[in-house]
Each structure stands twice: as C-alpha cells, then as structure tokens.
Amino acid sequence: MTSNLNLLQRSCALLLAGAALAFMGCDDTKPAPPAQPKTSQFETGRFALQKMIPAARSWSPDANPIQLTSSTNSESIGHDGKSGFWRAVFASPARGKSEPFSWSGLVDPDVPRGVNHGVEDTYSAANRSMMTWDLNYLKVDTDQAFETAQQHGGKTLLEKESKLPVTYLLDFDAMSHQLRWHVIYGTPAKLTVFVDASSGNFLRKE
C-alpha cells in the first residue's frame, strides 16, 4: 500500500513539473518588432494655425495671430501649399505681450513634433504693422493661394525652375484692411504674389 502511494506521489510530482515547464515555455515572450520610423506630416497653413490656437488661448484668452509663416526643407518645397513647419506670432492686447508658437510635423530630433512656443515679448497695439486679426476672416487656405499664384506668374517660373521653394506668409495689411497671403517663390524671392485670404482674389505681384 505504501509503495503504491509513493508511486502515485512521484507520478503527480512528475506531472506537475511537466505542466510547470510547459507553462514556462508558453510564457516566453517574443521580442517586440522594432518600431517603424515615423514619417513627416505636411499640412496647410490654416490647419497648422488651428492646431496652435488652443495653446495660444491658454497663454492668454484674448490672443489673436499677427503673422503666420512656413518653412521648406528637403522633403517639402511648398508646391502644394503645405509645409512640415509653421510658425505664428500671437499677441495679447490686454497684456501688451506677444509670443511665438509653432507647429511641426517633421521627423527631426532638433524639432519636436506638435505645438511648441517661444519666448514672450512686448507688444503695442498702436503699431499698425503688428495688428492682430480675427480668425473668422481666414477663409482661403494656402493650397488655394498657391493655385491663384500659379495663375499670375508662378506656373511659368516653376516650369523653368521646378525645384524652386515656395513659402507662405500671412499678415494683415492695415492700409487696405486686408488679410493677405504672400506666396513667395525662391529664397531670395524671385516672385511674390499677394492673395486675399478672405476672398481668394489676386491682389498684386512683385
């Protein structure tokens, strides 16, 4: 009887050991696959500005933009009205301060993705060259502004120089009371086309 009991105990022990080994084998985790590299994101000026607004309004509830500018790089030269990096300056008339904000979609260790901000500076609402403007007036985005600029000299220029970078600047002209896009061909500029950012109409070129 005792020998049978010992045999049964040894059998149970072997079964438990086998089960434990099987469990440990199943528990072995495979190494995670390497993370896929991120790709850069390119967006229009209005898209980038809308991304910056919450951060600017958090900085100051009355903040409105003064200026918006794009940058080009080896991945994007602005021919579709898009950029991977946009910079805006917002101002708070109530506080008498301005602050730069930026949006980046680039894969660059030196340029963090998303919205960031710079150093606060002084601001005077009396300076007509630094007037803020209401976002409701921005009806026309950079892709549309580019198409308009193409019809007024841009297309001819790019046919000659297909790699010429195109950058964008948005500001308010106090003299004409117009919110306008500057579509700038080349650095330094070989052609600048001004487009009404509310109506999309061609204004002038230089």
Set out the residue ranges of the language-model regions:
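Long, terminal "pre-/pro-" and other extracytoplasmic accessory regions
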Residues: 5, 25-206
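Bacterial N-terminal signal peptides that target proteins for export
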Residues: 2-13
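Bacterial N-terminal signal peptides
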Residues: 12-22
